[in-house]
Amino acid sequence: GHMAKAKREVSEQLKKVDVVFELVDARIPYSSRNPMIDEVINQKPRVVILNKKDMSNLNEMSKWEQFFIDKGYYPVSVDAKHGKNLKKVEAAAIKATAEKFEREKAKGLKPRAIRAMIVGIPNVGKSTLINKLAKRSIAQTGNKPGVTKQQQWIPVGNALQLLDTPGI
């Protein structure tokens, strides 16, 4: 069915990225997570982006940040709509992938941009975040046949490329 297809697509995308950005709603971090994410992402480094921080309780949020740190993730609280704290996303991605890039460097591989993808349930602000990180509007071209195959890498900052994953 639909879920199995989504799962397959995510697994395919995962092969191409170094880090996963899991986007959740800062007001309801746990219930705004996709339950199959953990199973699919498995061992990939993960940055948990708590969006809509402007609308959430700061005390609660620091508890949630600690919860995600304890799980081995790199949490960042942002307000995508107003473009707040977005610089921290790139910094967290650099931290989350440092080990992998050290290994690549040791093997003599050339330095390259970190490749990331965003996962999250609908209405957590994925499009807003992508557009703000990219500092431009990424066309919503979901209904034309064949677009899903044409994934594009969106440059973010100096060290990051974001895989535009329609509908994940």
What does each model-identified segment do?
Residues Q13, V17, V40, K71, ...:
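Conserved, well-folded catalytic cores of nucleic-acid-processing
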Residues K53-G120, I138:
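Canonical P-loop GTPase G-domain recognition
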Residues R115-K135, A139, T165:
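Glycine-rich phosphate-binding P-loop
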Residues D18-V24, N42-D54, G72-S77:
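Conserved beta-strand/loop subsegment of P-loop NTPase cores
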Residues H2-K7, G108-P111, A134-L160:
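Switch I (effector-binding) loop of TRAFAC-class P-loop GTPase G-domains
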Residues S11-K15, E39-N42, K81, T148, ...:
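Conserved catalytic network of the ASCE P-loop NTPase/AAA+ motor domain
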Residues R27-P29, K53-S56, K81-K84, V147-T148, ...:
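Conserved nucleotide-binding/hydrolysis micro-motifs of P-loop NTPases
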Residues G1-Q43:
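N-terminal accessory targeting/assembly segments
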